[in-house]
Design a protein with these regions (language model features):
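Extended catalytic core of nucleotide-activated donor transferases of GT-like folds
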Residues: 9-12, 21-112, 121-124
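Conserved catalytic-core segment of nucleotide-activated headgroup transferases in glycan assembly
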Residues: 125, 141-198, 205
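Short alpha-helical segment that forms part of, or immediately flanks, the ligand-binding pocket
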Residues: 215, 238-242, 253-257
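A short hydrophobic beta-strand element within the catalytic core of glycosyltransferases
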Residues: 224-225
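Aromatic "clamp/platform" in nucleotide-sugar-dependent glycosyltransferases that forms part
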Residues: 229
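Short hydrophobic beta-strand element within catalytic cores of glycosyltransferases
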Residues: 246-249
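Conserved acidic donor-binding segment of nucleotide-sugar-dependent glycosyltransferases
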Residues: 261-271, 279-284
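A charged, aromatic-enriched C-terminal amphipathic alpha-helix characteristic of glycosyltransferases
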Residues: 282-316, 320, 329-334, 343-344
Length: 344
């Protein structure tokens, strides 16, 4: 199949484009949210950059939507409407940003476009109405068992921790820094120590490293810390588990499902997490054993093959929704935000 999708979430796309299809990524001269293309990523040759304005509409077999605005954009540019005469699936990456537990998904109550969540918690958190909703859990290209744990430090991967604050558990970092020095990787981590009130000697901002370098450097840390309060399941957590790192994670959203007890600690009790982090930093052998358990669990649940197989099944089924009108059913409710619809 020739599948059109925008490059919205780099890590997720990195897994998705390793399937057996041809992937069409819109590109614009200035890049940006609507034209990032490959963005220099080392992806297979089956990933092609396309100019949407000149793309042959009939060359697209299906589209993976990731933003509500893409529906109207494709109808305008291609002359084919997702869910009407263009097979489509909507991928929701995130938890609701506000209004939980009453947050209505923009595609709630339509049947033409399946709504895919990346975690079971996300599916539960959103009000999907009568939309066909399902879960396809993340898949991770295996980076290999790179863990050395040579540094008695805690590794954290988080983007924009200063701006996002409590959402990403930034306020919890001082407590972890009291246990062991922190290495923080991710976008816009400069100034984090000052913003969080942590001594510079206890926190090193590593910045946004390339994937291979990130994996290598992160794997040198003794323990991976996942302090996120309200985010979807971070792919960085799953990558750390694939690397063979033991995990200390806040028991929020999907973390309790992803991290088994033998991999470290998952708890809403911060003191319990701090005790576990301190013990693992002081005991390299235990840290390594728990890291092996983390890797085994991640390979079993979040392996790339299982992820791609699930997507193949869904893409093959587009247009044959049981009890529905198929891809030719003209459900105009997909064009109207849930909060503005009139009940039929």
């Amino acid at each position: 199949m020739r599948i059109l999708l925008w490059h919205v979430h780099g890590s997720w796309t990195d897994a998705f484009v390793r399937g057996r299809h041809e992937y069409l990524l819109p590109v614009l001269p200035g890049g940006g949210a609507w034209g990032l293309g490959r963005a220099g990523r080392d992806w297979p040759a089956s990933v092609r950059e396309v100019e949407l304005a000149t793309l042959d509409a009939e060359s697209v077999d299906a589209v993976v939507l990731q933003r509500p605005e893409e529906i109207e954009e494709l109808a305008r540019v291609l002359g084919r409407r997702p869910g009407v005469d263009l097979p489509a699936v909507y991928l929701e990456h995130n938890t609701p940003k506000e209004g939980f537990p009453f947050a209505r998904h923009p595609l709630a109550d339509q049947r033409a476009i399946p709504l895919v969540h990346v975690t079971h918690f996300n599916r539960l958190a959103w009000d999907n109405g009568s939309a066909r909703s399902l879960v396809i859990e993340h898949g991770i290209p295996d980076p290999g068992h790179l863990y050395t744990g040579e540094l008695p430090e805690l590794g954290v991967v988080v983007n924009e921790p200063v701006r996002r604050g409590r959402v990403t558990g930034t306020d919890l970092l001082p407590a972890f820094a009291s246990v062991a020095p922190l290495q923080v990787f991710g976008m816009k981590t400069d100034g984090l120590a000052a913003a969080a009130g942590i001594d510079q000697a206890r926190l090193t901002s590593r910045g946004d490293l390339k994937t291979l370098e990130l994996h290598r450097e992160l794997a040198r840390c003794r323990v991976y810390v996942h302090p996120m309060r309200w985010t979807s399941l971070g792919l960085s957590l799953l990558e750390a588990m694939h690397l063979g790192m033991p995990v200390v994670a806040l028991a929020t959203t999907e973390a309790p499902r992803a991290v088994p007890p033998e991999a470290g600690a998952v708890s809403a009790d911060i003191d319990e997490l701090l005790r576990c982090a301190q013990r693992l930093v002081a005991n390299p052998d235990e840290a390594r054993r728990r890291g092996v358990a983390a890797r085994e669990a991640a390979l079993e649940r979040y392996g790339l093959g299982k992820f791609l197989d699930r997507w193949d099944e869904l893409l093959a089924d587009l247009g044959t929704e049981p009890g529905g009108r198929g891809i030719n059913g003209r459900d105009e409710r997909i064009l109207v935000p849930a909060g503005e619809r009139k009940t039929p």
